[in-house]
Amino acid sequence: MLDSVPGGALRDYLSVPLVDKGSDIHSLPLLSLDFETSGLDAKKDHIVSAGYVAIEAGVIQLSSARHELVRLDGALTEHSVVIHGITDDDVSAGEALEVVTGNLLRALAGKTMVAHHAKIELTFLTQACQILYGMSPRFPVIDTMRIAKRWLERRNKHIEQGDLRLFNLRKRYGLPMYQAHNALSDAIATAELLQAQIGHMDSSKTLPLRQFLS
């Protein structure tokens, strides 16, 4: 695949080997990612902002935190503005999709993606790569929502509507409130949730990456 990829951010990402799935989660480099979008359909909607932060050996690296707005040509819907608070003026001053995606891919190289309800991040990042590069790799991902769902199901816990939302899962683990629907705040909140989930597992055992991948 690498030979057919032109130089640039995607090639840089692909040139770094994926992490061994047997490696212990405690020692692995991760990147917690969140997108705010104009809607839920990656074919017709757009990434509005991207927030991400690295996790190295179980420690959230706040110095690596990044939040970027994506420049859009069209107007945002009133519904999406109410949710994420990003206005047309904000996105008109943002960076091009190519710049934001390139920065993200370089940050993600050699790391495993972490996201909450990762389907959103995966589908929109895949679509962005298709638009920009004509192709997209498969991105290994740890989905904190799926980890929580499996944990509850194994204990025969009834899952109510809303139980798997990031805000409610953080409450379950005693984590503090945070500013929801801001891409960087959500990315940091997701990183903290993953740390809490790992912390409630048997720390005396190796926890291989494959156990966490969606």
Predicted regions and their residues:
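Short, glycine/acidic-enriched loop or turn micro-motifs at the edges of active sites
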Residues: 35-39, 146, 189
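Short, amphipathic alpha-helical segments that act as regulatory/interfacial helices
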Residues: 126, 191-198
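Conserved non-catalytic scaffold segment of RNase H-like nuclease domains
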Residues: 2-139, 160-181
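Short alpha-helix plus adjacent loop in nuclease-associated cores
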Residues: 142-160
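Acidic, divalent-metal-coordinating active-site segment for phosphoryl/phosphodiester hydrolysis
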Residues: 182-193
